[in-house]
Amino acid sequence: MTLLAIGIEYQGTAYCGWQHQKHCDSVQQQLEKALSYIADEPIGLNCAGRTDTGVHAIGQIAHFETNASRPDKAWIQGVNTQLPNDIRVTWVKPMPEDFHARFSAVARQYRYVIFNRPVHSAILANRVTWENRPLDVKKMHAAAQDLLGENDFSSFRAAGCQASHANRNVQYLQVSRQGNFVFVDIQANAFLHHMVRNIVGTLLEVGRLDKPVEWVSELLKKQDRTQAGMTAPAAGLYFVNALYPESFELPRVVLDELLWQA
């Protein structure tokens, strides 16, 4: 039995998230079907971070066990020929038996992409979130810094979040602009359900000048989801990386690879 890790990118628009669902198509279902065809045996996947309906990924990582012996080309090009055009396997690597895509990860990175101009783009539908009002990115970034470190993120978790507690360690959070695009880049040890989208929805209120910079710090202390901003749309969210101990020697996506032109 061989343990393999794979890198995956996908546009999540057509899928009800990563995880298996009874009544709609998922990224996991498509990948397991394609991998099982190449392996000629049933394949089950475990991933680093389960994404929601409409959320994309450029650096998702998953692992599976197989009795099949195939060259890398079969696990990449062969599997990709069995996948729809909006899902791709980008690399494959044999892993030691103690590796687990989810539990071995020490951090995850997300990027949220906002298209900020009065008129929406005709070609970026479902790939970005449109904001027609001018955004003050400096104020958004300043407010975001109050979320760094280990905190109780109850104000930014979904009502149906099943996590046993709301403590998370946000290690990096930056808001920046490139032309008409505003990027929110965040790294944490783990994330609560809708945590990134709820943070972005809150920062948008600061960027529109509807709320002061200090509001975000106050929300964190209140630990009350009803007091924070609305959940930002799924379309702008990208799972960028899962980070692992260097001993596993896994590829990483460089954030600069996800740049946009306008």
Curated annotation (Swiss-Prot):
Record InterPro entries: PsdUridine_synth_cat_dom_sf, PsdUridine_synth_TruA, PsdUridine_synth_TruA_a/b_dom, PsdUridine_synth_TruA_C, TruA/RsuA/RluB/E/F_N
GO biological process, one term: tRNA pseudouridine synthesis
Active site per database record: D52
Molecular function in Gene Ontology: RNA binding; tRNA pseudouridine(38-40) synthase activity
Entry-linked CDD domains: PseudoU_synth_EcTruA
EC number(s) per entry: 5.4.99.12
Quaternary structure note: Homodimer.
Protein name: tRNA pseudouridine synthase A
